[in-house]
């Protein structure tokens, strides 16, 4: 999967 976000990671 791909991570989105700056200060934390969440699935796109």
UniProtKB/Swiss-Prot annotation:
**Which family is this sequence assigned to?**
Belongs to the conotoxin T superfamily.
What are the subcellular locations of this protein? Secreted
Lineage, uppermost ranks: Eukaryota, Metazoa, Spiralia, Lophotrochozoa, Mollusca
Which positions does the record annotate as the modified residue 4-hydroxyproline?
11
According to the UniProt entry, the note on domains is: The cysteine framework is X (CC-CX[hydroxyPro]C).
Keywords associated with the record:
Disulfide bond, Hydroxylation, Neurotoxin, Secreted, Toxin
According to UniProt, the name of this protein is Chi-conotoxin-like Ar1248
Organs and tissues of expression: Expressed by the venom duct.
